[in-house]
Amino acid sequence: MYVRSQTAGERVTESVSNFIERKLKLLVNKDKSQVCEVNQTKFLGYTIQKDGNLSIAKKSIERFNEKVRSITKRNRGVKIEQVIAELVPVMRGWLNYFHQARCKGLLKNLDSWIRRKPRCYRLKQCKRVITLQRFLERPGVDGWQSRILALSGKGHWRKSGCPQAHQALSNNRFDEAGLYNLTLNYDRLNNKKKPPCARACPVV
């Protein structure tokens, strides 16, 4: 329920709670009942902002991130293609539910982070220096630059953010592998990028 002030909210909460408990003989969950600013509440995973727009609640984002982390754990021992195949339905389902929120900036950051996770996963699979160097050289990374990264003492996560790793496992390669793109599909779901009109053909 939405009211004009904190005082009014507390008064209405007490009145409604009394009605529910005394008249309807039901128990009000005090832990889930609160009086606060509209942008501090969450409903079905959404938060309503002061301007009336929807945003995604922090807990909903955290749960999504945990699912991604679980799928991209570096010790799973499965092929990267399987990792991508498991990510796709999770990402698609999450966006289909939350696409009505104003969240394009968030989605761009998530896309970047999610692509880096399988990039890191794949680098870890190259357990030897020579294996990593050859993996980087295969898609066209300069041999000397490949060796620099392969010999680097950086951890796999830091390596995955380096230019050589981005070139070897580019965004285009992930697109070709079928990795779901949150930002592009957000535009599609909200009709911000309409597909080009088909060429008219005469009907005979």
Model-derived regions, located:
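Non-catalytic terminal/accessory segments
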Residues: 1-204
